[in-house]
């Protein structure tokens, strides 16, 4: 039951508009404004008393519910009949709660329902009329409980929860080298504007820079001095003079950190190469960027000059930068730190790296497995013995042997009615007597009665014409479309109901608790009731459609018959155990 | 006779092979007597012969223990006997009834010799179908001018599951020969064999509801020749009982196991196929994985 109300926490409260949803177990108030956090959930058995204004007085239709904890909830309805309906519903629910105090234990799981879950169930019932019909048929008549009904529909509930998952924020595809300074043109001073986003990207792509930041700031230098040195190093790279870079690196050891190859990245690459299966035919130990070969690799600034060997460590190729940047973008944002403090960001990234490094550590067993695979790969196939596949030889036997071997089965397992020799003899005598009769008397006159012949002809004509109309020349049309709409809806609803009952029935076996035994009894009664409804429906259908409806109803009855048979046999077995 | 008519067969010349159920265990339990049944059938056969002068009729008796030809309208011994012996019986069927009586006597003697008494009281449908197909094959080989053959099964006995393989083989042979099998079941149950036979071969299957009107059913549905069936609406089945019999216990099943080599049907899981000897359950992948498991465990021990 659902009504539109205005909720008040006290009498003079202006009130909040929303909808009041009532069930025998719970009372739920949802305001119309989604942003409002004034949502109310009250268990029925927690309601102590209710007061209401009388019709005909000057007051609006109010219903005041007092809980056992002393709180009051005032609902103002749109009209007095709505208020009376809710009042009567709550009165009945309260009476049931008092009549069945022992069943509160069964209702305990309902209390643990979250507000969102409860709203979701009501929403699903509101949207799906068929689901609402089933819910009304089974839950309100107490064949199933709320939890039993929804336990088979977790997909419906889970579908909405999937939508709540947030999409992870990615990274920009702009490279760090794309940062451009601003210049005033008159002096040689350039200015770099760093945002937290840029800093995050630098830390993600260059672990050595991140580690240097943690080591030097703020003990040895300020954050501004740190970034000044970093961009000085970047400037030296952009020039073509590696000799100047080497000279400055010799003087300033802190600047040299930015000019050396990133040792952390090299270590990670070596670990990844170690995880590669050694049976793969791959030169994983050789440099995969060809920088060890002369005249290979393009410099970042696009030049192709030959570099002197002693400054080889100061080189960085464009390919390495591109690969590193792509790896970082694909890895995505692995931490959710939104802090403006640069140190917190650097430390969080370092911890994330350490965690992933621990996960990727190679254990002893993995080493052993790698060694086994390595030794197995070195075997040469042409020196191995041919493998013997475990296949049985195929033999098509003589069919006569097959049929003769089956004779024993027939004798050992008798089937069908046993016909004694005396009965056979009498039957043969009767048959010969019939032949003698027809030889003596000949064909009967008349051979067939005219009214019988007409009846046969009429029924055949009706059968053939009916079959033509049903099968027809339109394969898209099914027989259900030819039924009246009410009968068709009834058939489909019965099918849905029987599926629900049968699913719960078979999932209750084996019966291990009293709860399951009670549940199976309820389901059996509900199935008996449905069986009677099926028979009534068959009789109420018109005579020309009855045969088709019988064909449609037969699988439903077979499913119910199987359930009844299992119920009776299981009941006998459990009764025999008790005896 | 003066001159044999030349063979000029048109589309509607038919050869009807009738399989007549003479199982005494069935006829002792029916509401209609065998003599009444024979009246309808003989009148029907006379009508078929009257539809076209060149039509042929062959009757095969299907007994409890044996089968035999009891009438063949193309034999010269059945021509020329036009004397009437005073009764209402046409003399043309005198030999049929005489042979039927002899057949029943022989069938009774054969049933006495049977050791097994636990058989389902079914008739030898597979045997009579095979004999009908042999006769039709001889007709096919006599020349390209021949009447169009079809088979009509008049049966009331229940299905014998032990004949499943033989019946299905006959049905597939008839399908290959393009010979339709019409079936008229007058028993109380449904016959899965006859339903499948008519469905597979393109014949007509019908279960009459009023047995005292059998002649009307036969002339309305089953007297139609193959050419005319293209213009006539005949009863169509709403559903076909496609259940099979298992090869191990010979009982009817609707769900079971099947050998992927020879397509034998079993009602329970076997380790080996009793027809072709294939071993079930053991496959190459299972052994390969177990072998690799052993190899992995050895070094760690």
From Swiss-Prot, chain A:
Main location: nucleus
Keyword Nucleus appears in the UniProt entry: yes
Keyword Coiled coil: no
A Gene Ontology biological process term: DNA-templated transcription
Residue ranges occupied by any BSD domain in the UniProt entry: 107-161, 186-238
Transmembrane domains' residue ranges: none
Superkingdom: Eukaryota
Matching InterPro entries: BSD_dom, BSD_dom_sf, Tfb1/GTF2H1, TFIIH_BTF_p62_N
Compartments, record wording: Nucleus
GO cellular component: transcription factor TFIIH core complex
Keyword annotations from UniProtKB, A to Z: DNA damage, DNA repair, Nucleus, Repeat, Transcription, Transcription regulation
Function as written in the Swiss-Prot or TrEMBL entry: Component of the general transcription and DNA repair factor IIH (TFIIH) core complex, which is involved in general and transcription-coupled nucleotide excision repair (NER) of damaged DNA and, when complexed to CAK, in RNA transcription by RNA polymerase II. In NER, TFIIH acts by opening DNA around the lesion to allow the excision of the damaged oligonucleotide and its replacement by a new DNA fragment. In transcription, TFIIH has an essential role in transcription initiation.
Similarity section: Belongs to the TFB1 family.
Subunit and partners: Component of the 7-subunit TFIIH core complex composed of XPB, XPD, TFB1/GTF2H1, GTF2H2/P44, TFB4/GTF2H3, TFB2/GTF2H4 and TFB5/GTF2H5, which is active in NER. The core complex associates with the 3-subunit CDK-activating kinase (CAK) module composed of CYCH1/cyclin H1, CDKD and MAT1/At4g30820 to form the 10-subunit holoenzyme (holo-TFIIH) active in transcription.
Name of the protein this chain belongs to: General transcription and DNA repair factor IIH subunit TFB1-3
Species of the source: Arabidopsis thaliana (Mouse-ear cress)
Swiss-Prot record, chain B:
Gene3D superfamilies found in the cross-reference section: von Willebrand factor, type A domain
Signal peptide: none
Pfam families, per database record: Tfb4
UniProt keywords, alphabetically: DNA damage, DNA repair, Metal-binding, Nucleus, Transcription, Transcription regulation, Zinc, Zinc-finger
Zinc-finger ranges (C4-type): 259-276
Molecular function terms from GO: zinc ion binding
Subcellular location(s) per record: Nucleus
InterPro entries on file: TFIIH_Tfb4/GTF2H3 (IPR004600), vWFA_dom_sf (IPR036465)
Swiss-Prot/TrEMBL GO biological process terms: nucleotide-excision repair; regulation of DNA-templated transcription
Tree of life domain: Eukaryota
Tagged with keyword RNA-binding: no
One cellular-component annotation, GO: transcription factor TFIIH core complex
Keyword check for Transcription regulation: yes
Main location, first listed in the record: nucleus
Membership in a protein family: Belongs to the TFB4 family.
Function: Component of the general transcription and DNA repair factor IIH (TFIIH) core complex, which is involved in general and transcription-coupled nucleotide excision repair (NER) of damaged DNA and, when complexed to CAK, in RNA transcription by RNA polymerase II. In NER, TFIIH acts by opening DNA around the lesion to allow the excision of the damaged oligonucleotide and its replacement by a new DNA fragment. In transcription, TFIIH has an essential role in transcription initiation.
Assembly mode: Component of the 7-subunit TFIIH core complex composed of XPB, XPD, TFB1/GTF2H1, GTF2H2/P44, TFB4/GTF2H3, TFB2/GTF2H4 and TFB5/GTF2H5, which is active in NER. The core complex associates with the 3-subunit CDK-activating kinase (CAK) module composed of CYCH1/cyclin H1, CDKD and MAT1/At4g30820 to form the 10-subunit holoenzyme (holo-TFIIH) active in transcription.
This protein's name: General transcription and DNA repair factor IIH subunit TFB4
């Amino acid at each position: 039951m659902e009504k539109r109300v205005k909720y008040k926490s006290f009498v003079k409260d202006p009130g909040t508009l929303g909808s009041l949803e009532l069930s025998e177990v719970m009372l739920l108030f949802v305001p119309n404004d989604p942003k409002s956090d004034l949502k109310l959930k009250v268990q029925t058995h927690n309601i102590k008393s209710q007061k209401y204004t009388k019709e005909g007085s000057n007051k609006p239709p109010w219903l005041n519910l007092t809980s056992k904890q002393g709180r009051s909830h005032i609902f103002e309805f749109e009209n007095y009949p709505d208020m009376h309906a809710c009042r009567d519903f709550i009165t009945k629910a309260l009476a049931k709660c008092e009549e069945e105090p022992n069943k509160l234990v069964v209702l305990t799981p309902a209390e643990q329902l979250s507000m969102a879950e409860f709203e979701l169930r009501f929403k699903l019932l509101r949207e799906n009329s068929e689901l609402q019909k089933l819910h009304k048929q089974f839950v309100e008549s107490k064949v199933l409980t709320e939890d039993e009904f929804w336990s088979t529909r977790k997909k419906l509930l889970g579908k909405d929860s999937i939508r709540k998952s947030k999409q992870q924020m990615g990274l920009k595809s702009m490279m760090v080298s794309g940062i451009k300074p601003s210049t005033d043109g008159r002096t040689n001073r350039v200015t770099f504007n760093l945002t937290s986003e840029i800093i995050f990207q630098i830390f993600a792509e260059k672990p050595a820079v991140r580690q240097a930041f943690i080591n030097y700031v703020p003990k040895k230098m300020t954050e501004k001095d740190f970034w000044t040195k970093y961009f000085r190093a970047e400037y030296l790279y952009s020039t073509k003079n590696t000799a100047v870079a080497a000279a400055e690196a010799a003087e300033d050891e802190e600047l040299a950190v930015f000019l050396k190859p990133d040792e952390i990245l090299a270590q990670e690459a070596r670990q990844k190469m170690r995880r590669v299966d050694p049976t793969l035919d791959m030169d994983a130990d050789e440099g995969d960027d060809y920088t060890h070969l002369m005249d290979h690799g393009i410099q970042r600034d696009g030049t192709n000059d030959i570099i002197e060997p002693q400054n080889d460590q100061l080189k960085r190729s464009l390919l390495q930068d591109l690969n590193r940047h792509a790896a970082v973008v694909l890895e995505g944002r692995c931490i959710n730190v939104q802090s403006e403090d640069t140190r917190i960001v650097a430390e969080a990234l370092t911890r994330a790296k350490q965690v992933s490094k621990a996960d990727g550590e190679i254990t002893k067993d993995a080493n052993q497995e790698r060694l086994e695979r390595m030794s197995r790969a070195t075997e040469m196939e042409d020196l191995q013995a041919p493998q013997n596949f475990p296949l049985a030889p195929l033999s098509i036997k003589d069919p006569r042997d097959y049929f003769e071997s089956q004779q024993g089965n027939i004798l050992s397992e008798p089937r069908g009615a046993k016909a004694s020799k005396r009965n056979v003899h009498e039957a043969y005598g009767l048959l010969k007597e019939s032949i003698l009769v027809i030889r003596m008397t000949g064909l009967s006159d008349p051979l067939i009665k005219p009214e019988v012949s007409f009846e046969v002809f009429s029924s055949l004509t009706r059968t053939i014409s009916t079959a033509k109309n049903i099968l027809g020349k339109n394969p898209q049309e099914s027989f259900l479309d030819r039924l009246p709409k009410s009968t068709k809806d009834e058939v489909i609803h019965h099918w849905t109901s029987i599926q629900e009952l049968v699913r719960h029935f078979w999932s209750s076996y084996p019966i291990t608790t009293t709860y399951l035994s009670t549940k199976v009894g309820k389901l059996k009664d509900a199935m008996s009731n449905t069986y009677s409804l099926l028979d009534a429906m068959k009789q109420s259908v018109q005579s020309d459609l009855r045969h088709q409806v019988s064909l449609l109803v037969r699988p439903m009855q077979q499913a119910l018959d199987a359930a009844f048979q299992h119920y009776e046999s299981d009941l006998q077995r459990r009764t025999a155990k008790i005896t | 006779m003066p001159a044999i008519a030349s063979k000029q067969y048109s589309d509607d010349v038919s050869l009807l092979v009738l399989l007549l159920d003479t199982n005494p265990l069935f006829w002792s339990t029916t509401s209609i007597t065998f003599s009444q049944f024979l009246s309808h059938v003989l009148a029907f056969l006379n009508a078929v012969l009257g539809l076209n002068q060149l039509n042929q009729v062959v009757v095969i008796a299907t007994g409890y223990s044996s089968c035999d030809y009891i009438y063949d309208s193309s034999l010269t011994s059945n021509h020329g006997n036009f004397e009437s012996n005073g009764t209402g019986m046409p003399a043309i069927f005198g030999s049929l009834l005489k042979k039927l009586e002899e057949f029943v006597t022989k069938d009774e003697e054969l049933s006495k010799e049977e050791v097994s008494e636990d058989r389902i009281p079914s008739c030898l449908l597979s045997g009579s179908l095979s004999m009908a197909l042999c006769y039709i094959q001889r007709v096919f080989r006599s020349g390209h001018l021949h009447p169009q053959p079809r088979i009509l099964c008049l049966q009331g006995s229940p299905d014998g599951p032990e004949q499943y393989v033989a019946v299905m083989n006959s049905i597939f042979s008839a399908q290959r020969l393009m010979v339709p099998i019409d079936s008229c079941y007058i028993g109380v149950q449904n016959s899965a064999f006859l339903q499948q036979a008519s469905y597979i071969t393109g014949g007509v299957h019908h279960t009459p509801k009023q047995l005292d009107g059998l002649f009307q059913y036969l002339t309305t549905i089953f007297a139609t020749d193959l050419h005319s069936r293209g213009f006539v609406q005949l009863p169509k089945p709403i559903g076909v009982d496609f259940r099979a019999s298992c090869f191990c216990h010979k009982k009817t099943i609707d769900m079971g196991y099947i050998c992927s080599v020879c397509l034998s049907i079993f009602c329970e899981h076997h380790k080996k196929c009793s027809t072709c000897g294939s071993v079930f359950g053991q496959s190459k992948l299972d052994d390969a994985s177990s072998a690799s498991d052993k190899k992995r465990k050895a070094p760690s021990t």
